[in-house]
C-alpha cells in the first residue's frame, strides 16, 4: 500500500513538472512571438509594399531617420559590409509593456537584390565578426534569403548594425547579371504604437471615445486607469481603459471633446527607411580598365621619352 502511494506521488510530481515546463515554454514563446520583427514576418509575405513603403511603418507611427552604408561596387562571390545606422538619443527611456521605463531596443530589415544573401560564418573575416558582435540574423522567409531581419536588440550597443553580405556570382547563378542594384532598409528604435490586430500598445496616445464630463477616474490595482465619461447629450456612460505606464492629462469633473487626448504621448522612438545602390562589377571589365589605364600611362611615358630624344637631336644639330 505504501509502495502504491509512493508511485502515485511520483506520478503526480512528474505530471506537475511537465505542466509547469509547458506553461513556461508557452509564456516564453508568446513573448518572443510578440517581438519585432516577428510581427511583420507573420503578417506580410513581403516587407516592402508595391508603393515602396516598408510594412514596419504600420506599427511604428513616428518617422525617424535611418541610414545605410554599402560599397559602391563589389566583385562576385565576395563578402562585404552593409552598415545600418539607427541614431537616437541614448539618454531616452521608453515605456515598457509592464508600464515601467526602460532602454530602447532597435531592429532592422534589409532588402537585398535577388542572389545576394547573408554570408556564411566561414567566409566572414575576424575583423568583420568583431563588428557584428553577438547579433543573430535571420531570413525573412526560408525562400527569401535576400531579405534579412534582426531585432529587437539593445539600442545602446547596436545603434549601428553590420550585416555581412555575400555577393552572387553570375558564373554560377544565371539569374544574376553585372548591373547596378538597389538596396532597401528599414530601421526602428523603440516599441511600436499599433499591434498587427489593430489594437494599441501602451506606447501611444489614448484619446476620448466620447465627448462629455469625466465623472470618475479609477486607478486600477495593477496599473492603468478606467475613465468614465458621461455624454452631455444623452447621459450615457462611456468607460475608456488606459493601460499602465501612461500619464493622464485630464481630471475628474473636466469637460472633454471627442478624440481629445486623455494621455500624453510617451513614444520617444520611431521608424525610418532608406535605400542605396551597389554595382556588381565584372572582374574582366576591371582587368580591361586596368589594362587600358596602363597602356595610356605607358603611351604617355613613351611620348615624353620621344620628346626628350627629339630635343636632344635638335640641340646637337644646333651646336653642330
From Swiss-Prot:
Keywords tagged on the record: Chloroplast, Electron transport, Heme, Iron, Membrane, Metal-binding, Photosynthesis, Plastid, Signal, Thylakoid, Transmembrane, Transmembrane helix, Transport
Needed cofactors: heme
Protein name (Swiss-Prot/TrEMBL): Cytochrome f
GN (gene name): petA
Primary role: Component of the cytochrome b6-f complex, which mediates electron transfer between photosystem II (PSII) and photosystem I (PSI), cyclic electron flow around PSI, and state transitions.
Assembly and interaction partners: The 4 large subunits of the cytochrome b6-f complex are cytochrome b6, subunit IV (17 kDa polypeptide, petD), cytochrome f and the Rieske protein, while the 4 small subunits are PetG, PetL, PetM and PetN. The complex functions as a dimer.
Binding site for heme: 36, 56, 59-60
Pfam families, per the entry: Apocytochr_F_C, Apocytochr_F_N
Claim: Heme is one of the keywords in the record: yes
Amino acid at each position: 500500500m505504501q509502495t502504491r502511494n509512493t508511485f502515485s506521488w511520483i506520478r503526480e510530481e512528474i505530471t506537475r513538472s511537465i505542466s509547469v515546463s509547458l506553461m513556461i515554454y508557452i509564456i516564453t514563446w508568446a513573448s518572443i512571438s510578440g517581438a519585432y520583427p516577428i510581427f511583420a514576418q507573420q503578417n506580410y509575405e513581403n516587407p516592402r509594399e508595391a508603393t515602396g513603403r516598408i510594412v514596419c511603418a504600420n506599427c511604428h507611427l513616428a518617422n525617424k531617420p535611418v541610414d545605410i552604408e554599402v560599397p559602391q561596387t563589389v566583385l562576385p562571390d565576395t563578402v562585404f559590409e552593409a552598415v545600418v545606422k539607427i541614431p537616437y538619443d541614448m539618454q531616452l527611456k521608453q515605456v515598457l509593456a509592464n508600464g515601467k521605463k526602460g532602454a530602447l531596443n532597435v531592429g532592422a530589415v534589409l532588402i537585398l537584390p535577388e542572389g545576394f544573401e547573408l554570408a556564411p560564418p566561414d567566409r566572414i573575416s575576424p575583423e568583420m565578426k568583431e563588428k557584428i558582435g553577438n547579433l543573430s540574423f535571420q531570413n525573412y522567409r526560408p525562400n527569401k534569403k535576400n531579405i534579412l531581419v534582426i531585432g529587437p536588440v539593445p539600442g545602446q550597443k547596436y545603434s549601428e548594425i553590420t550585416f555581412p553580405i555575400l555577393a552572387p556570382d553570375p558564373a554560377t547563378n544565371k539569374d544574376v547579371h553585372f548591373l547596378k542594384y538597389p538596396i532597401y532598409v528599414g530601421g526602428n528604435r523603440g516599441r511600436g504604437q499599433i499591434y498587427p490586430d489593430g489594437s494599441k500598445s501602451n506606447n501611444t496616445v489614448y484619446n476620448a471615445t466620447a465627448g462629455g464630463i469625466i465623472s470618475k477616474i479609477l486607478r486600477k490595482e495593477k496599473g492603468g486607469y478606467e475613465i468614465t465619461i458621461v455624454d452631455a447629450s444623452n447621459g450615457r456612460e462611456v468607460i475608456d481603459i488606459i493601460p499602465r505606464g501612461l500619464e493622464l492629462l485630464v481630471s475628474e469633473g473636466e469637460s472633454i471633446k471627442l478624440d481629445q487626448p486623455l494621455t500624453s504621448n510617451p513614444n520617444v522612438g520611431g521608424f525610418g527607411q532608406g535605400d542605396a545602390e551597389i554595382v556588381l562589377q565584372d572582374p574582366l571589365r576591371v582587368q580591361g580598365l586596368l589594362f587600358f589605364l596602363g597602356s595610356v600611362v605607358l603611351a604617355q611615358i613613351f611620348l615624353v621619352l620621344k620628346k626628350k630624344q627629339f630635343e636632344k637631336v635638335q640641340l646637337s644639330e644646333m651646336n653642330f
